[in-house]
From Swiss-Prot:
A lipid is attached at residue 19 (S-diacylglycerol cysteine). Monomer. It comes from Nitrosococcus oceani (strain ATCC 19707 / BCRC 17464 / JCM 30415 / NCIMB 11848 / C-107). Gene3D superfamilies: Lipoprotein localisation LolA/LolB/LppX (2.50.20.10). This is Outer-membrane lipoprotein LolB. The gene is lolB. Its main location: membrane. Residues 1-18 form the signal peptide. It is a lipid-anchor. The keyword Lipoprotein applies. Transmembrane segments: none annotated. Belongs to the LolB family. Plays a critical role in the incorporation of lipoproteins in the outer membrane after they are released by the LolA protein.
Length: 201
């Protein structure tokens, strides 16, 4: 009977522990050192998926919709779904060849996503840089004009490639703090992205 009662108590404690929220890390004593370690860890993430809500404001137009992004190494697939019958745009490819598809239109092919988006939509996104910005990293190969960190060693602000990026929220995904809300601003374009779901691997 004693062993039975002890087993019940132990099982109850295990179940309670499983229901408790994950402990958030404490602020870093050295955010810059934590940031260096964080960059090395994030750079190892090659395969991921995200979905979220996107708002785009250009000079004369504005759109809202859903964004789904899949990254597999250098291969990517981006799907924009716009509400109220505004349609969808699918963009996929790699650093050498990119294809854009829209309903009832012939596929468009080019060597860069920026070229295709500028031709089809009238505005362009730095897709090659966004791949890294979405993870909370600077894009390699572009000088960082300015950046700032929070007390946990995560990016708060980043100025790179003519874009101003602000990270307003992070969420814990498989032991990584990944962005949950990002604002991106360019002289001719503003984006607001709320990421609802992350999946790594």
């Amino acid at each position: 009977m004693k062993w039975c009662r002890l087993s019940i108590i132990l099982m109850s404690l295990i179940l309670l522990a499983g229901c408790m929220p994950l402990r958030q890390p404490s602020p870093s004593a050295d955010p810059q050192q934590t940031w260096q370690e964080r960059q090395f860890a994030l750079q190892e993430i090659e395969d991921w998926n995200l979905s979220g809500r996107l708002a785009i404001n250009a000079i004369k137009e504005a759109w809202t919709g859903t964004l789904r992004w899949t990254q597999r190494g250098d291969e990517f697939k981006i799907l924009w779904l716009f509400p109220l019958g505004q349609g969808s745009v699918e963009l996929y490819g790699n650093p050498d060849r990119v294809t854009l598809r829209a309903p009832k239109e012939e596929p468009m092919i080019a060597t860069s996503a920026e070229e295709l988006l500028g031709t089809r939509l009238g505005w362009s996104l730095p897709v090659s840089g966004l791949r890294y910005w979405l993870l909370g990293l600077p894009a390699p190969g572009l000088p960082v004009v300015k950046s700032s960190l929070d007390s946990f060693g995560r990016l708060l602000r980043l100025s790179q490639g003519g874009w101003q990026i602000r990270y307003l929220d992070y969420k814990w995904i498989e032991n990584f703090a990944l962005p949950g809300k990002i604002f991106l601003e360019h002289p001719k374009l503003r984006l607001r992205l709320v990421i609802d779901h992350w999946q790594l691997g």
